[in-house]
Amino acid sequence: NDEFDQYLKRFNYTFKNENKETAGYAILKNKKIILAMDIGPSPIGPQSNDYQSGALSFEIISSGKKLISNSGYFSNKQNKLNKLSKSTALQSTLVIEDYSSCSFKKLKSLGYLVDQGLKIMNKNIVFEDNYWKISASHDGYLKKFGSIHNREIEFYPEQTKFIGTDKIVRKNKDKNVKFDIRFHLDPDSKVMKTQDN
């Protein structure tokens, strides 16, 4: 409420976000690098009409320029690109058997809403001067494939080095699943192969 905000301002109260999580995103940053990862559950109902199924997707920004990003959102709900832009394949994350981690249903007035969502588990955020880590799991593939997706991204600021680990934990280990791990590079990014790959 407005009165409470004025009270806090008058007595110079400021609050620091110690857990580094805002609206379902972990955001770690220093003067040069920003690492952001989607670690929030999928919304439900009308709140999901603009949701992109990008659980555990991430973006890296260096000196104000995106290096790894998600593909963006097409907001015109009458266009086929709207549904496509909500798919997991267009996010920088792991995809099993070309299925999105959430399913959508179309409602004429609201567009595509999350029909079957996902939960986030095992969230962990570490933010120290010389070491950052964001890790979490989601159950978006549990019902269809009996699988949990775990992701961990580490950053070593002194070396400007990122290490990412994805794991698929499966109930039925007898059946193989096809998966892709996608990293969408900003069109202005320049990438080169190093000697150690």
Where are the regions that the model predicts?
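CBM-like, beta-strand-rich accessory domains located in the C-terminal region of large
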Residues: Y73-N197
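Carbohydrate-active enzyme catalytic cores, enriched for enzymes
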Residues: N1-S69
